[in-house]
């Protein structure tokens, strides 16, 4: 009996030690263009295959419809959650064509809390949002914050920089809880909004990994950033080689969350 007890104690100790080590997190950001591909077809199963192909833990989705006529009145977050076996969270920002339009998150882990924050909006009927979830990591590792967003596309837009400031102000209230923000920022790495975010967050790739236009990408406007920098190691960031399912390419970051 003492031998069994010793082995159990050893296994428990090893488990506790493992839980204190780095923890891998795979994040995907994907502007899905409401599921409409370059062939003009709305095909959520095709979008789901792109997502499933990299087996992410957290997914930030932009340009997502729910109950909208143009996409067959489908609840796209729910459908993608079912297809990918992930928990869907939807942040509706605009009433459109009989339904709602906004950002969504898919999560492998339980969602403890969610909030949809409004960002600055200078254009009628084009409210922008920042969707936030707090997920509970396994093995007692604590909470992780994940944000999905889509910032205005217009050149010299008056919205983008204030939106970035709002994101930074929000994370300043979170007391250093590890966080990731991912989305279509509609700016290259040297754009004012991305530079503003980088005062607080760390981009998961240096230089530029082009994500748009989808057929022959020439610029990176989709980004993944982490906070605080000391809690994260970037293992890999890459753009997925898929050019039909949407008008953007998806970007994947493989990260390690370090012990506090």
Question: What annotation goes with each model-predicted range?
Answer:
Residues 2-3, 11-83, 90, 95-103, ...:
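N-terminal, active-site-proximal structural segment of metallo-dependent hydrolase catalytic domains
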Residues 19-27, 99-101, 107-113, 125-148, ...:
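Beta-strand-turn-beta hairpins that frame and shape the catalytic cleft
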Residues 24-32, 47-73, 106, 133, ...:
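Active-site beta-strand/loop signature of hydrolases that rely on acidic residues for catalysis
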Residues 34-36, 116-121, 149-157:
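Surface-exposed cleft-lining segments at the edges of enzyme active sites
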Residues 35, 95, 111, 151-153, ...:
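Short, solvent-exposed loop/turn segments at secondary-structure junctions
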């Amino acid at each position: 009996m003492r031998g069994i007890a010793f082995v159990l104690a050893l296994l428990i100790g090893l488990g506790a030690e493992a839980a204190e080590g780095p923890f891998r997190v795979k994040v995907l950001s994907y502007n899905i263009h409401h599921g409409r591909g370059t062939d003009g077809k709305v095909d959520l199963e095709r979008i789901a295959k792109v997502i499933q192909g990299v087996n992410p833990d957290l997914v930030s989705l932009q340009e997502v419809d729910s109950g909208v006529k143009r996409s067959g009145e489908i609840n796209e977050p729910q459908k993608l959650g079912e297809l990918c076996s992930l928990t869907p969270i939807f942040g509706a920002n605009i009433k459109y064509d009989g339904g709602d339009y906004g950002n969504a998150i898919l999560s492998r882990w339980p969602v403890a809390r969610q909030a949809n924050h409004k960002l600055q909006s200078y254009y009628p009927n084009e409210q922008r949002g920042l969707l936030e979830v707090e997920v509970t990591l396994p093995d007692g590792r604590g909470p992780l914050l994940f944000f999905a967003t889509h910032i205005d596309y217009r050149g010299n837009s008056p919205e983008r920089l204030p939106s970035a400031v709002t994101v930074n102000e929000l994370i300043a209230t979170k007391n250093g809880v590890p966080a990731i923000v991912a989305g279509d920022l509609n700016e290259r790495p040297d754009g004012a909004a991305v530079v503003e975010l980088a005062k607080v967050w760390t981009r998961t790739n240096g230089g530029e990994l082009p994500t748009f236009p989808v057929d022959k990408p020439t610029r990176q406007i989709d980004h993944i950033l982490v906070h605080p920098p000391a809690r994260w190691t970037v293992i890999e960031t890459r753009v997925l080689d898929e050019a039909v399912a949407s008008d953007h390419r998806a970007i994947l970051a493989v990260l390690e969350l370090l012990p506090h």
